[in-house]
């Protein structure tokens, strides 16, 4: 069974490039401090890596 990751948006996307905004939205994060739980897949890990400076990630 794949691990679950708890992803929280901790920094604002205001002033960030459009590709970073799109990545945050693709993760399902809309507002500051919103949290989603996703399975650990290569695609999700790549998105997390791209915007890691905006997120906090924990194992769920």
Swiss-Prot record:
Source taxon at top rank: Bacteria
Keywords: Ribonucleoprotein, Ribosomal protein
Keyword match Cell division: no
Coiled-coil intervals: none
GO cellular component: cytosolic large ribosomal subunit
Annotated S-S bridges: none
Database matches in SUPFAM superfamilies: Ribosomal protein L30p/L7e (SSF55129)
A single MF term (Gene Ontology): structural constituent of ribosome
UniProt GO BP: translation
A Pfam match: Ribosomal_L30
Subunit structure: Part of the 50S ribosomal subunit.
Family to which the UniProt record says this protein belongs: Belongs to the universal ribosomal protein uL30 family.
Record's protein name: Large ribosomal subunit protein uL30
Organism: Bacillus cereus (strain G9842)
């Amino acid at each position: 069974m794949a691990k679950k990751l708890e992803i929280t948006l901790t920094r604002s996307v205001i002033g960030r490039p459009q590709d970073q905004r799109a990545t945050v939205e693709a993760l399902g994060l809309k507002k500051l401090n919103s949290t989603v739980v996703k399975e650990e897949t290569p695609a999700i890990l790549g998105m997390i890596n791209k915007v890691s400076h905006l997120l906090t990630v924990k194992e769920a």
